[in-house]
Amino acid sequence: MTAIETDTPSNKVKEDESTDLRKDREKKKRSRVKQLLADIAKQVDFWFGDVNLHKDRFLREQIEKTRDGYIDISLLASFNKMKKITTDSKLIARAVKNSSVVEINLSGTKIRRRFPLGEKPQDVDSRTVYVELLPKNVTHSWIERVFGKYGMVVYVSIPRYKSTGDPKGFAFIEFETQEQAAKAIEVLNNPPEEAPRKAGMFPKTVKNKHLPPVEVTEHSITEGCGTEEKKKKKKKKSKARKDSVEKAEEDTKEQDMDIISEGVPKRRKTVSESSVPDVQEADKQTAKKEKKKKERAESFDQSEKVRQGKRKCSSSEEHDCSSAKQKKSDTKDLPQDEKPMVTQEVLQECKELSTEEEKDAVDKKEISVPKVKRKRKKKHKERHRVGEEVIPLRVLSKTEWLVLKAEYLTLQRASMASLKKSMSEMNHISEEEMQTQPSMQSFDIKNGKVETVKNEPLGPQFVCGVIGKITSSDPLQGRKYVKDAFSGVCEVVYVDMLEGDTECHVRFKSPEDAQTAVKTRSDLQGKHNWKLQILAGDNEQRYWQKILVDRQAKLNRPREKKRGTEKLIAKAEKMRLAKTQEASKHIRFSDGF
């Protein structure tokens, strides 16, 4: 019985601990789910809100397709932003259960707006601001945090490049009222000095790929980023100067201490304590020390002039020092046995002088160091305050931006017109050249008007005995390699092969070229291990039929349509490349020059 009684309380304690742990886990799960549900509800309410639906054509069309306005929740789960949060349709339905914007059907699989969508407001442009010079990695949350201080931000649009997905460097922010937009423009319109004077960013592209913009990092958002680096450099220089001055002070102190120690005569040694060679070595060392001291004194003469708090010796101290030096010189002249013993009074005086100097220097350092630290801290705080308040952005109303856009479009049209004119002048062929070259156009007169009809270029015409077949034991290296092999013997028009093939067809310019190639068959066999055969009869006709079929398939292949400015710019680019190739050609002079 005693064993049972002792076990029961411990079991109860364990059960209590386990229940506490379960409660803690449940609490943690609830907090996470609450945040998740709040994020889902916020996103869905935004999608079905008036501001977004007036701009989101895809979602508006999906709602208009249905008779009752319901759309599947699975469609919302397929959106990229919702994928980052969750893909569970049931969790989405649970999140928007108590929403004031949307409602769910009885089965919990479809969702719709509670109230029908009204007409689009007319004052959207006046409530919208345009902002440029944004950082490269700008996000919606960053814009909401910066612009949300001056009003309720209802919509943020960050245009991005299709090719890379990078932001274009500008954005449009819609506020709830016009007053909030005007306040944001007044406070946040602080463009840096390096920025262009005229506002309006219209990014340029080359072959549907944007030119790399100027990188603006997070550090460049706060004002005075470059000035901070300069100040840091100045601080480093000032620190180095202070360190050099302090070193000079320490060296001068050591020098003074050495002079005092030199003024004090050394204790007399007996014959048993030191030998004669030891004394000679000691004299050499003292001579070296004196030389070093003289060099130090000369190098730090300038620093001693600038240095404040320099110790000035009184007449009594100078007298003591000079007397000590005289004593030292006298003792040097005397033999070692006759040197007098140093009194305790002289040693105490020297110690007192050194301690007074050290105290003065320490007091000066204690006074100067805290002042410098305080100044640095104040500057650092002021810098942070400036960085929080001032952001180098250019902000203006969307109505002003639309005016700039119209100006840009007129300039673009004018430049395109001048480009067309210059291209037509370049493509214009003179009458003399037209007479020399065969005309590719036929003229048709209808109703008194002359219409030009372009004759389509014909394909390769059938010529007997110009097709050769090459077979190799190893994969062929390429078309250029095959052409180069025949270059010294005959002229090759086309090589029909794919990469890695062991067989290929060669079309020669004339039957005579084909016959000359056959004559060099043995050379090709020995050098390249190729077998050459000229096609004839049915094999030749089948191959010519294949040529025509391949050509027709190539002509009927769907091409990427280019219209407007893209087509014009592509033509101009081709002409520019042709010009550069002509200019890069070598000029060949005759032997006479």
Swiss-Prot record:
Cross-referenced SUPFAM superfamilies? RNA-binding domain, RBD, Winged helix' DNA-binding domain
The record places domain HTH La-type RNA-binding at 30-121
What CDD domains would the database entry show? LARP_7, RRM1_LARP7, RRM2_LARP7
UniProtKB keywords: Differentiation, mRNA processing, mRNA splicing, Nucleus, RNA-binding, Spermatogenesis, Transcription, Transcription regulation
What biological-process terms (Gene Ontology) are attached? box C/D sno(s)RNA 3'-end processing; cell differentiation; mRNA processing; positive regulation of protein localization to Cajal body; positive regulation of snRNA transcription by RNA polymerase II; regulation of mRNA splicing, via spliceosome; RNA splicing; spermatogenesis
Q: Where is the composition biased (Polar residues)?
A: 1-11
Note whether Iron occurs among the keywords. no
**UniProt GO cellular component terms:** nucleoplasm; nucleus; ribonucleoprotein complex
Single GO term (MF): 7SK snRNA binding
The residue ranges of the RRM domain are 127-205
Report biased composition (Basic residues) as residue ranges: 231-240
Stored InterPro entries? La_dom_prot (IPR045180), La_HTH (IPR006630), La_xRRM (IPR014886), LARP7_La (IPR034946), LARP7_RRM1 (IPR034887), LARP7_RRM2 (IPR034910), Lupus_La (IPR002344), Nucleotide-bd_a/b_plait_sf (IPR012677)
Q: Which residues form the xRRM domain?
A: 461-574
Q: Where is this region: Disordered?
A: 1-28, 191-363
**Acidic residues bias: start-end ranges:** 248-259
Which residues lie in Basic and acidic residues bias regions?
12-24, 295-307, 314-340, 348-363
SMART domains reported for this sequence: LA, RRM
- Please name the Pfam families in this protein's record: La (PF05383), RRM_1 (PF00076), RRM_3 (PF08777)
| Job of this protein | RNA-binding protein that specifically binds distinct small nuclear RNA (snRNAs) and regulates their processing and function. Specifically binds the 7SK snRNA (7SK RNA) and acts as a core component of the 7SK ribonucleoprotein (RNP) complex, thereby acting as a negative regulator of transcription elongation by RNA polymerase II. The 7SK RNP complex sequesters the positive transcription elongation factor b (P-TEFb) in a large inactive 7SK RNP complex preventing RNA polymerase II phosphorylation and subsequent transcriptional elongation.
Query: What is recorded about the domains?
Result: The xRRM domain binds the 3' end of 7SK snRNA (7SK RNA) at the top of stem-loop 4.
What is the annotated quaternary arrangement, including any partners?
Answer: Core component of the 7SK RNP complex. Associates with box C/D small nucleolar ribonucleoprotein (snoRNP) complexes.
**Family membership noted in the UniProt record:** Belongs to the LARP7 family.
Protein name per Swiss-Prot or TrEMBL: La-related protein 7
> Which organism does this sequence originate in?
Xenopus tropicalis
By which gene is this protein encoded?
larp7
